[in-house]
Amino acid sequence: MNLALEILEKRGFLKQCTNLEALSTLMDKERVVFYVGVDATSTSLHIGHLIPFMVMAHLQRQGHIPIALVGGGTTKIGDPSGKDAMRKILSKEDIEKNVKAIRAQLLRIIDFSHGYILDNSAWLDNINYIEFLRDIGVCFSVNRMLGFETYKRRIKDGLSFIEFNYQLLQSYDFYMLNKIKNCKLQIGGDDQWGNIVSGVDLIKKKLGTEVFGLTLPLITRSDGKKMGKSEKGAVYLDAELYSVYDFYQYFRNVPDLDVKNFLYLFTFLGDDEIEHMSSVKGYLLNKAKETLAFEITKIVHGEDAALKASSAARAAFKGSEGDRADIPFFKLALDSLEGSILLIDLMVLSKVVSSKSEARRLINSGGVYIDKVRIGDQDYCLNKDNFINGEIELKIGKKRILRVIL
């Protein structure tokens, strides 16, 4: 097998390929142009998006040429893959804003001085519908499309015609990239298999060229929690939506059983180093978790931000010298105290919990601390005297910490 593909297989990235043997032969012969697509449904990518772009980085390191395709055009329709209901249709202005934001994030992760970031609105926005149906639509079998899992799942509950067109447009993207950039490989999540195979078939029918599709496994956590979700919601790559500190802590606190797998998926560390680092158990595995958190934070936010997050975590949880300024904080208005404020109300106000009932449950279970002192009273109140030097430290369980500042 080609070295680049061996690396992907070793690190757990390979799920399905349209023709792995032929792709391996091609990659031995030439620098292959490949692409990963992402729709502009949000102002930020989340960590679920990182997997295909980590693959992109690995392939680029082996000399192959990446294209990141931001779906300024396809976002106007919405991909039904993996969805139980139709996506919300975004305004043109929102899509343009999202495309710009996602482009900026990708530039931090991938070196596009030897690659491309493109927007499929460049060719989709001006399509003539009749010509598209005659030229492209004729190549698709409705019966075959309905056989793909994406449409099987949705057809029972209702699939709009606009969503049904999505597969044609994604296939057309691959067709256009093959024509203008000689792109021969599309990479995506395994839920994209039907769309990717359809693009491979379209190019074969229209151009007589063999191209390839490769899908990646859905990443799950050993504790059953959905990858990319936390108590605070989606783990975004935008520091304004999900702080660098919280991003670091998310990976620092992954279950022990996931450490080795995540080191392979989310870092560029060598095999020997990963195997050695993850061979220990118990508290000794904390070093590997810290390395995982630092490496992925460095990739997404840069080395300076990763160092600050690491320093803040040590200051918060180990009592070591570190920069507490990088620990998340909540600014409490003085007039909110009005003499005093219930701890339960402060927890809801600062959004460390979503409800008063959750706050009561945590206090009753002994999981709430003020300045390292456990609080067991649901009616506990704070006043200005609690805020030594203008702040307190609110800790929830072992892993969540917040500075509350006046």
Curated annotation (Swiss-Prot):
L-tyrosine binds at Y35, Y166, Q170. It is found in: Cytoplasm. InterPro entries: aa-tRNA-synth_Ic, Rossmann-like_a/b/a_fold, S4_RNA-bd, S4_RNA-bd_sf, SYY-like_C, Tyr-tRNA-ligase, Tyr-tRNA-ligase_bac-type, Tyr-tRNA-ligase_bac_1. SUPFAM superfamilies: Alpha-L RNA-binding motif, Nucleotidylyl transferase. ATP binds at K229. A motif ('HIGH' region) lies at residues 40-49. It comes from the Bacteria. Its EC number is 6.1.1.1. GO terms for cellular component: cytosol. Residues 341-405 form the S4 RNA-binding domain. It catalyses: tRNA(Tyr) + L-tyrosine + ATP = L-tyrosyl-tRNA(Tyr) + AMP + diphosphate + H(+). A motif ('KMSKS' region) lies at residues 226-230. Its main location: cytoplasm. GO terms for biological process: tyrosyl-tRNA aminoacylation. Keywords: Aminoacyl-tRNA synthetase, ATP-binding, Cytoplasm, Ligase, Nucleotide-binding, Protein biosynthesis, RNA-binding. GO terms for molecular function: ATP binding; RNA binding; tyrosine-tRNA ligase activity. It holds the Pfam family tRNA-synt_1b. HAMAP family: Tyr_tRNA_synth_type1. Catalyzes the attachment of tyrosine to tRNA(Tyr) in a two-step reaction: tyrosine is first activated by ATP to form Tyr-AMP and then transferred to the acceptor end of tRNA(Tyr). Belongs to the class-I aminoacyl-tRNA synthetase family. TyrS type 1 subfamily. Homodimer. This is Tyrosine--tRNA ligase. The lineage of its organism: Bacteria, Pseudomonadati, Spirochaetota, Spirochaetia, Spirochaetales.
